[in-house]
């Protein structure tokens, strides 16, 4: 759903969403007991997709940390209705050097998506016992999703992110 409200920075109010309500948000609600050494992929996007006739599309994909558990956060939303992306997703990409700029592919469970990054928020922390390596890329998602009843939904122009994280905490 579009996000609306007011963001106050240094005492100055900024309207979010505008008259068209075209600001989008994703809530990251994580909890639990995480292992000391963990890796994951995560990506999300939302907005109105022109190839989908202006329908509101949301995308939530992840990998690695849930492999082999039978559960995942993977889902595709169309006009507020959630369609589960069943099974594991396959991620094809590289964050070595400047290769993060190359398109990323995420497939599986009816999803065939491409992510084209335009910015990488790269962070590295190395405190010997505690380490964090994150490549959080922002860019544009496009592709298609096939629903359980066989409808193929093509989408494009969704601004979002995809990340690779490896933490030792």
What name fits each language-model region?
Residues 1-169:
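Structured soluble/peripheral alpha/beta segments that form catalytic or ligand/cofactor-binding pockets
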